């Protein structure tokens, strides 16, 4: 909400309350990409734990997961609200390591955002970048460990990795 207000003010865009509310509602009502539910189910069948680490608020995250029909597929949902620091600050990624009680090298951080992937990689997490648009890798000083076109190949990629 604050980011939307800041961006519209900075760009000198007049935005009505109705348009603002409609834009914010878009974050609460999302549809997953077609392969996401089945991929999450396969990962669960492999005994994998799935978690979300987001700059979003707990309310936004739970509403979005519910609208997407994905809430039951995530065992852990972490919001930066708990530490009042945003990604890509290292404290955020440490929060995930602590909450999951798993060493960084045994996690896989998956993101479609280059800056988010770079922050996680700089922290020391293995990273898969989901590059649905075939965009060039951003020049952020670190690169993802693997680049995926979508999530459908993730279970096969992980079969050789320990749980």
Regions found by a protein language model. Name each.
Residues 1-21:
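A metal-dependent, Asp-based hydrolase signature
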């Amino acid at each position: 909400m604050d980011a939307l207000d800041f961006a519209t003010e900075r760009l000198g865009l007049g935005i009505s309350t109705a348009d603002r509310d409609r834009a914010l509602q878009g974050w609460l009502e999302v549809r997953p990409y077609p392969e996401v539910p089945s991929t999450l189910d396969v990962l669960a069948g492999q005994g994998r734990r799935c978690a979300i680490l987001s700059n979003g608020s707990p309310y936004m995250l739970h509403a979005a997961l519910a609208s997407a029909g994905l809430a039951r597929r995530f065992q852990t949902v972490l919001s930066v609200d708990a530490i009042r620091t945003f990604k890509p600050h290292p404290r955020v990624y440490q929060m995930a390591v602590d909450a999951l009680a798993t060493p960084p090298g045994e996690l896989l951080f998956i993101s479609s955002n280059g800056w988010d992937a770079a922050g996680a990689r700089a922290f020391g997490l293995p990273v898969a970048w989901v590059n649905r648009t075939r965009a060039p890798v951003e020049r952020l000083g670190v690169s993802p460990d693997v680049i995926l076109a979508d999530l459908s190949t993730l279970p096969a990629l992980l079969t050789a990795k320990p749980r």
